[in-house]
């Protein structure tokens, strides 16, 4: 039963890119909708929990919210450039490599021979998976788009990795972070989406896009609960399975075109990224 609960974050987070893309809208509208949805959920959670706020908790959580918006906005741009089925495995892989290396360098997480061996195998699998999922059979069909997408996803990963490093480095409790983090998300989204488009940031579509924001925030709370039930290492590993839903869903539901060879490479690449993520979780608990 605990494992089933621990799979909820992967299920929720895996569907978010599909729902956002299906709902459409500009990157600005999607970013505002997501952050407003997350804030709405955070306010509701506030009344059903007993968070403890300190200046450090509020300040660091607010900054992580700003970093999340950077990560999310650039990831949304990548969806439009190279598609969900290609962007999600690459994005997940970059985040895994980034958080793992920061964990090793800053927090000395690989302190045994076994962890070092498992960690390097995991990184090799993830990097291999990224290369496979980014493969394009016909180079003229999107080499420039892929380069642009990779740069965009790298910036996105920096935002997400920075978030994780701050939360871990300052030992911020998940429940305590939710509301100030969501406030940081909305304020930074308002600033980042202020210019860069002619369409309205707030309309009916923006309201509709709060739904995936609520779903993401629910996955965040579920992750906090899952970590308490099965441990951080197992919870982290299981959360990586969301990329399978996003990738397969992008191909089937969003009808993103792939050649037979590209499809094979994407599937194998996703498997490698997931295995790498699981191995990192094993290394954390070893």
Swiss-Prot record:
Spell out the Pfam families in the cross-references. Answer: Sugar_transport (PF06800)
Annotated compartments: Cell membrane
Protein name, UniProt field: Putative sugar uptake protein lmo0176
Which UniProt keywords are listed? Cell membrane, Membrane, Sugar transport, Transmembrane, Transmembrane helix, Transport
The way this protein sits in the membrane is described as:
Multi-pass membrane protein
Family recorded in the similarity comment: Belongs to the GRP transporter (TC 2.A.7.5) family.
- PANTHER family recorded for this chain? TRANSMEMBRANE PROTEIN 144
The UniProt entry's GO CC annotations, sorted and at most eight, read: plasma membrane
Membrane as a keyword of this entry, yes or no, is yes
Leader sequence range is: none
Record-annotated membrane-spanning stretches:
4-26, 33-55, 114-136, 149-167, 177-194, 207-226, 230-252, 264-283
**Highest taxon, organism lineage:** Bacteria
Question: What GO molecular functions are on record for this protein?
Answer: carbohydrate transmembrane transporter activity
């Amino acid at each position: 039963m605990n494992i089933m609960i621990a799979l909820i974050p992967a299920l929720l987070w895996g569907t978010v890119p599909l729902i956002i893309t299906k709902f459409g809208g500009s990157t600005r509208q999607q970013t505002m909708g997501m952050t407003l949805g997350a804030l709405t959920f955070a306010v509701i959670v506030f009344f059903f929990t007993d968070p403890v706020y300190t200046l450090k908790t509020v300040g660091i959580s607010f900054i992580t919210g700003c970093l999340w918006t950077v990560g999310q906005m650039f990831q949304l741009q990548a969806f439009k450039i190279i598609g969900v089925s290609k962007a999600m495995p690459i994005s997940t892989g970059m985040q895994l490599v980034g958080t793992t290396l920061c964990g090793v360098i800053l927090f000395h997480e690989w302190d045994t021979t076994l962890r070092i061996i498992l960690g390097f195998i995991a990184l090799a699998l993830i990097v291999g998976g990224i290369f496979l999922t980014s493969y394009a059979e016909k180079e003229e069909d999107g080499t420039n788009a892929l380069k642009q997408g990779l740069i965009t996803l790298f910036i996105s990963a920096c935002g997400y990795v920075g978030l994780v490093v701050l939360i871990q480095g300052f030992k911020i409790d998940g429940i305590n972070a939710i509301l100030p983090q969501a406030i940081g998300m909305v304020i930074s989204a308002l600033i980042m989406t202020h210019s860069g488009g002619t369409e309205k940031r707030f309309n009916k579509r923006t309201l509709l896009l709060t739904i995936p924001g609520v779903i993401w925030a629910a996955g965040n709370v579920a992750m906090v609960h899952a970590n308490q039930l099965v441990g951080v290492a197992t919870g982290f590993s299981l959360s990586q399975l969301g990329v399978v839903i996003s990738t397969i869903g992008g191909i089937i539901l969003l009808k993103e075109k792939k050649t037979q060879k590209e499809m094979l490479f994407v599937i194998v690449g996703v498997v490698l990224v997931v295995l790498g993520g699981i191995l990192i979780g094993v290394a954390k608990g070893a």
